[in-house]
Amino acid sequence: MGIQQTIFMKKLPIAITEEGFIQLIKHTKQLHHKVAFLLGYGSGIRISEVCNLQKNDINLKEKKIMVRQGKGSKDRVVPLPKMFKTKMLDCIPIKCKKRALQKAFTSIAIKSKLMETIPNVHFHSLRHGFASRAVENGMPIHHLRTLLGHSNISTTNVYLEMNPKGALKSYEELF
């Protein structure tokens, strides 16, 4: 009688690449959808946080967004994407609810053929794209944790696993 050990492989998040994001935006006709997608990809905020944003949460001068009552009822400050233009403020608050925004995202991802290159892509993949780009560009994981609003660093560490090139680069620099 032996003991069987089960090994669980954790699925890595599905992240949108910069090319995928550009492809998505090119096929997005509604400005409020473009703004929502830009905020997800450029600031790493969740779909619910995008839908809850108010004009006074965005500080154009300091290029910051105050995310109020994020997951776990926590407030945090995140960067305003460089591509965010003053006229985009007219779209805040976003004119649709979470479900409608996710549906629009899926529809545009299909039309833009993004679903063909990244199967099962969804709005949250924008946030994963933000996080994986941050890690690829050398952002310390504890800074990323703060921006994403994670209470546990192990939640953020998954983005390190998505970037094996970073580990290889660190190895090459050491040896």
Where would I find each of the regions flagged by the language model?
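Catalytic-site neighborhood detector that most strongly recognizes the C-terminal catalytic loop/helix
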Residues: Q69-G72, L148, I153-E173
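Basic, Lys/Arg- and aromatic-enriched nucleic-acid-binding interface segment
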Residues: I14-I47
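Short, charged phosphate-coordinating catalytic segments
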Residues: G40-E62, A109
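Conserved tyrosine-mediated DNA breakage-rejoining catalytic core shared by Y-recombinases
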Residues: N52-K85
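Flexible interdomain linker/hinge and immediately adjacent N-terminus
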Residues: M1-Q23, R68, I92
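N-terminal DNA-binding recognition helix of tyrosine site-specific recombinases/integrases
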Residues: M1-T6, G44-S48, K103, S107-I108
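Active-site-proximal segment of tyrosine recombinases
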Residues: E49-V50, V121-H122, A131, G138-N152, ...
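Active-site/catalytic core of tyrosine-dependent DNA strand-transfer enzymes
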Residues: P81-I118, H124, F130
